[in-house]
Amino acid sequence: MTLQQQIIEELRVQPTINAQEEIRKSIDFLKEYAKHYSFVKGFVLGISGGQDSTLTGKLAQLAVDELNKEVGEMKYSFWAIRLPYGVQADEQDCQDAIDYIKPTGSYTVNIKDAVDASVKALANAGVELNDFVKGNEKARERMKVQYSIAAMNGGVVLGTDHAAEAITGFYTKFGDGGADLMPIFRLNKRQGKQLLAELNCPEHLYTKVPTADLEENRPSLPDEVALGVSYDQIDDYLEGKEIPEEPRQLLEGYYLRSQHKRHMPITIFDVFWK
């Protein structure tokens, strides 16, 4: 088995999909989990205004709508969480995503004061964070807030990790990578677009240039620039196609270096890293 085949198998990517079937799989997954655990009253997700959170949020709300219809009461909810750091450049996209998803409820928590306080406390202790690490601080603060809201509402936290993100490790460990359920795991980037198109999402929410927007020295830095490889190349690789040698080596290097992100904390019994 080649490394490419191993990665595809691990991330459960299919070369082609039926969008309606994948939508149904994700909705049923969320419903089954909620029904299995009596303490679950709904789902929580941070909404950034990008493709991945818009898709995951819409799937969650559809699952909640079906659950409530089945039980004949408003037992379940989906809470969409806005988590800007100060003023967000693409705030209108965030509002458009909320309008499209139509969540049961929403909260807005500006994380700037909390992040800045943490950065200041570390500086006072003699630890000066660089811009990249401060970006990770933002991602972890956002996830911390989501878990607090989930705890107070009987919710579980959803993540937006998908195959094109998982292969590169392009997320913050214990930040956006730290969630309870990952409804779109198995899909690559273009397949996520297919689902949103099927769900009649406003096109600009899934055709915009993807960016994590965590770094202040490089605001709105496109993912593809940060990674040095295009999502089309990543998706082609995940679908089993041949891609040029340079991006292939880059992707496989990312995958091998980020294995720790796809595992629980490592114990003496783990050997994958050796």
Swiss-Prot record:
Binding site for ATP: 46-53, 160, 189, 211
Catalytic activity: deamido-NAD(+) + NH4(+) + ATP = AMP + diphosphate + NAD(+) + H(+)
Binding site for deamido-NAD(+): 140, 173, 180, 260-261
A single BP term in Gene Ontology: NAD biosynthetic process
PANTHER family: NH 3 /GLUTAMINE-DEPENDENT NAD + SYNTHETASE, NH(3)-DEPENDENT NAD(+) SYNTHETASE
Family per record: Belongs to the NAD synthetase family.
Function: Catalyzes the ATP-dependent amidation of deamido-NAD to form NAD. Uses ammonia as a nitrogen source.
Name of this chain's protein: NH(3)-dependent NAD(+) synthetase
Source organism (scientific name): Lysinibacillus sphaericus (strain C3-41)
